[in-house]
């Protein structure tokens, strides 16, 4: 049966995902940045309360995946922290300036991760040659690759995802970006064994007083009175679709 991973941005969202049938959680911070490394407090809280597998993302900033020496040092420290806290896996990825996998740095990450299952995240979708990259990741011992098939969403990239799945000796290919209940059957019919979804929505802040003329970010139009949360009903619906597909 296909595995359902839910992207979560808080302990509460991780618990919601767990309660509604998620098989695994990718734990992140900063949804508007596409997911950054969670704080130590969040990591500890989730480790204590969530019982399904949780894989934190290790990504020090938004933007590209070519990192300075200081950023890479932080990545290695975060990898060690996640391992010491007892998480079963993590999610990360590093590229060189030419769009190839930074093999020396990824080798250091793999050494620091030890027995943890490492997912190479959507840095894969920014690589120059996906098939060569897949070979490199297999050589590194990467467990899985999260990808939209190098398109803006996974449904558009489904043909590339199928090509990657068919590649001999490849890591597990997990489809992600825009995967929802309404299009999930396309991925299941194509033989995708793992799917990744945020299964969520922006929720209004409970604050009654609002200073509408102020933004906490450089985007003057950013809505400071909403937050991204996992929709338990959406998770349950996706899990039900997967179970029905398996029963066919």
UniProtKB/Swiss-Prot annotation:
Molecular function terms, GO-annotated: copper ion binding
GO cellular component: cytoplasm
Keyword hit for Repressor: no
Keywords, alphabetical: Cytoplasm
Principal cellular location given in the protein's record: cytoplasm
Family matches, as Pfam families: CutC (PF03932)
Compartments, record wording: Cytoplasm
Record has Kinase as a keyword: no
Coiled-coil ranges (or none): none
Gene3D superfamilies assigned to the protein according to its UniProt record, in alphabetical order: Copper homeostasis (CutC) domain (3.20.20.380)
UniProt-listed HAMAP family: CutC
Subunit note: Homodimer.
Annotated family: Belongs to the CutC family.
Protein name: PF03932 family protein CutC
Organism expressing this protein natively: Escherichia coli O81 (strain ED1a)
């Amino acid at each position: 049966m296909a595995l359902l991973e839910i992207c979560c941005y808080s302990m509460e969202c991780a618990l919601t995902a767990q309660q509604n049938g998620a098989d695994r959680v990718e734990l992140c911070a900063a949804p508007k940045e596409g997911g950054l490394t969670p704080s130590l407090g969040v990591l500890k809280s989730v480790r204590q309360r969530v019982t399904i597998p949780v894989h934190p993302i290790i990504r020090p900033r938004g933007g590209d995946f070519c990192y300075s020496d200081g950023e890479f040092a932080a990545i290695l420290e975060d990898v060690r922290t996640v391992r010491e806290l007892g998480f079963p896996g993590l999610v990360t990825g590093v590229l060189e300036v030419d769009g190839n996998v930074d093999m020396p740095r990824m080798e250091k990450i793999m050494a620091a991760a030890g027995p943890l299952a490492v997912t190479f995240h959507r840095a894969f979708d920014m690589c120059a040659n996906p098939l060569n990259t897949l070979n490199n990741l297999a050589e590194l011992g990467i467990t899985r690759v999260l990808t939209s098939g190098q398109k803006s969403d996974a449904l558009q990239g489904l043909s590339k995802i199928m090509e990657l799945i068919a590649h001999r000796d490849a890591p597990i290919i997990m489809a992600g970006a825009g995967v929802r209940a309404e299009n999930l059957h396309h991925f299941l019919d194509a033989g995708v064994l793992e799917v990744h979804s945020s299964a969520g929505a922006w929720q209004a802040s409970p604050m009654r007083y609002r200073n509408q003329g102020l933004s906490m970010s450089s985007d003057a139009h950013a809505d400071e009175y909403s937050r991204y949360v996992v929709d338990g009903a959406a998770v349950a619906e996706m899990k039900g679709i997967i179970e029905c597909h398996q029963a066919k």
